[in-house]
Amino acid sequence: MSNDPIDVVLIGGGIMSATLGAMIQRVQPGWSIRIYESLGEVAQESSNPWNNAGTGHAALCELNYMPEAEDGTVDPAKAISINEQFQLSRQFWASLVAAGDLPEPQTFINSTPHMTFVRGRENVRYLRRRYEELKDQPLFAGMEYSEDAETIAEWAPLLTKKRNRKQRIAATRQLAGTDVDFGALTRALVDDLVASGAELALNHRVCSLKRTKDGLWRIRARHEVGRTPREALARFVFVGAGGGALHLLQKSGISEIEGFGGFPISGQFLRTTNPAIVAQHKAKVYGKAAVGAPPMSVPHLDTRVVDGETSLLFGPYAGFSPKFLKTGTWWDLPGSIRLGNIGPMLAVARDNFDLMKYLIGELMAGREKKLAALREFMPTAKSEDWELIAAGQRVQVMKKDERKGGVLQFGTEVIAAADGSIAGLLGASPGASTAVPIMVDLLKRCFPERFEGWLPVLRELIPTVGTTLNDRPEEAEFVLKRTAAVLKLAQ
């Protein structure tokens, strides 16, 4: 490896680093790029298809983006915002597919109807109100609603088969939903980066980040095969290491990370590959979260397409582990505690009793209780058809709050040094689905003097970047149809 400073170092071989690298390579093709990945392959943590649900998060079915207010009203603003962000990701992927820089789209994205399914009178009323708010929104065009069991049975037979006919049920369906294999997408993006001159350093664990007197970043890494140390200098560093990002940003010494902590939540899914069952369900069906449950724990029964094979997934079942990564250590959480963040972390523990109660309940749940949750969606589920698999770790952001002392923040947050020389990403859902708008915002924040010059290229890749679609019905319809045609998705 050369001793010359590297223009861009990406730490972590997941979807975020791959997306940022793909953008930088196109807006500034002469820059050198190196990716450090501690494991032997990229996309093995949160981006691995079995470590996430693979939902193309566009708020078509996820109720947590449109909660019911105390007065019974539902505000579509958050759902519209999430959908707008996903459209930017779709445009970026479509541009790379059209240019031949990504493989056949079916290798990483497939049409899968997105449904919401609820039970009980009050939940039915809520879903009806949600539908009324969304049905005329351009980005939600084509959404269907039904309280009729026979209609719902046509959409997703497993939901109604042998269900008590007296139970009030309702569902929405949006045929334009997607299932995304973020592992395959990450690998394809990284392959394209390497083919264009980027360097991929696998089995390299970054141990420290230090600022030099001349404004560069000194990166010390260890080759995990042979334990040999490596050093490099970088002009810009992105820490896209998933749950490992907090530790590395803390080691960098930037003041912007002070007061931030991480709350790790583990997950499990039930999975079946039984062809007779899989053939009866082609949808991602989301329900309503339990009281206190974090957003990524909304129960859902999903069609998954991974490596061309179709299966069904149900969950997630949340749990607690102090590990920040699936391959992390039991010291991850205690090792992240600092004088500057212990106050916010204690405040979060004090104010989130419902979450703690929920997690304890999930930890205590045995297989029969997990199957009972599945049978609320699929009454005919049999234990012998389903296996329990471990999903990835999610580290929720805890941060200072002037009023409460500390708050638990769901979603993602970009932490960047004031001079823009280093940035990292904390948090979870909707995460990968909105990687493209997150990285566009990061470029604008970290390279303000260059961003205007990059905009023409970004607009070629993402035509509506910097604008919105939902308030322009004709443009929304055009973009949805164009990206669907390129990505071979339902329109």
Swiss-Prot record:
Keywords from UniProt, A to Z, are: FAD, Flavoprotein, Oxidoreductase, Tricarboxylic acid cycle
Which Cys residues form disulphide pairs?
none
Listed HAMAP family:
MQO
List the InterPro entries: FAD/NAD-bd_sf (IPR036188), MQO (IPR006231)
* KW Flavoprotein (keyword) present: yes
Q: What EC number(s) are associated with this protein in UniProt?
A: 1.1.5.4
Name assigned to this protein: Probable malate:quinone oxidoreductase
Q: NCBIfam families attached here?
A: mal_quin_oxido, PRK05257.1-1, PRK05257.1-4, PRK05257.2-1, PRK05257.2-5, PRK05257.3-1, PRK05257.3-2, PRK05257.3-3
Q: What class of enzyme is it?
A: oxidoreductase
Q: Which cofactor does it need?
A: FAD
MF-aspect GO terms? 2-hydroxyglutarate dehydrogenase activity; L-malate dehydrogenase (quinone) activity
Q: Name one GO biological process term.
A: tricarboxylic acid cycle
Pathway membership of this protein?
Carbohydrate metabolism; tricarboxylic acid cycle; oxaloacetate from (S)-malate (quinone route): step 1/1
Organism superkingdom:
Bacteria
Which species does this protein come from? Leifsonia xyli subsp. xyli (strain CTCB07)
Indicate the family of this protein.
Belongs to the MQO family.
